[in-house]
């Protein structure tokens, strides 16, 4: 009885949270064709969503980004041959592969891990692909249901703790935790906790060394890949050769007087 009621409430919240907001500004949309040119397997593609749930996540994380996907290249394809380049976790389908074109009208950002060899990238993508078909963590939906109001009264110092969403069940996932687990499977850092300890050398001197601690995957949010010092931000406009001198500004248009017109 309780399970049935919980599922009914979850489905209602899903429908509510996934309705688009009335205003979405596309400041920096990159076409799928250009994105695909500069994306590399293993890249994280962040998305600024246009749904109610996106607004909640952006508010709680104080970030532009509300969704995270993993670019897998040509490792998966639809039955009709259409490429499925991204792996993501969403409430309306669990973990699945989707085409890059799904986000052609959205603001996006490419975050790239550094120094991975081909074997590690393969292992990373294999991990994500092996999760396809896993259910979305519905406890996350219940958690987000607490923040249906546009601006919940959440103190800044507790926002991170409140975003420890989900049940922790390894067979269920949300977008950022799925990708965090994939990178943790190859021991690649995102935002680890770092402590220092003193060790004595053979010369009886003490030196400090840093110890990295893996944070629980449920604590990760999309913005962490943007903030991480271990991921570089790739901007296609810059990569393809940006020249600011080629821009024609409105205020620089030639006036009729300058052209000798009467």
What are these regions (language model features)?
Residues 1-262:
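Cysteine-nucleophile amide-bond enzymes
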């Amino acid at each position: 009885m309780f399970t049935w009621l919980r599922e009914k409430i979850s489905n209602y919240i899903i429908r509510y949270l996934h309705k688009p907001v009335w205003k979405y500004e596309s400041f920096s949309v990159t076409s799928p064709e250009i994105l695909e040119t500069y994306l590399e397997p293993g890249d994280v593609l962040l998305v600024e969503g246009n749904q109610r749930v996106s607004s909640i996540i952006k508010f709680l994380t104080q970030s532009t980004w509300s969704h995270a996907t993993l670019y897998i290249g040509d490792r998966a394809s639809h039955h009709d041959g259409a490429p499925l380049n991204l792996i993501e976790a969403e409430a309306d389908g669990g973990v699945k592969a989707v085409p890059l074109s799904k986000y052609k009208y959205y603001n996006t950002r490419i975050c790239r891990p550094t120094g991975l060899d081909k074997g590690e990238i393969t292992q990373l993508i294999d991990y994500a692909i092996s999760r396809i078909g896993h259910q979305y963590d519905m406890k996350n939906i219940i958690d987000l249901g607490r923040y249906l109001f546009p601006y919940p009264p959440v103190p800044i110092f507790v926002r991170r703790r409140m975003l420890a969403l989900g049940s922790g069940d390894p067979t269920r996932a949300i977008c950022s935790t799925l990708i965090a687990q994939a990178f943790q499977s190859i021991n690649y850092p995102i935002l680890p906790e770092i402590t220092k300890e003193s060790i004595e050398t053979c010369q009886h001197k003490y030196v400090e060394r840093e110890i990295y601690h893996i944070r629980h995957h449920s604590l990760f949010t999309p913005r962490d890949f943007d903030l991480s010092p271990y991921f570089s931000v790739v901007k296609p406009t810059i990569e393809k050769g940006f020249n600011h001198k080629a821009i024609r500004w409105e205020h620089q248009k030639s006036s009729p007087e300058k052209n000798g017109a009467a």
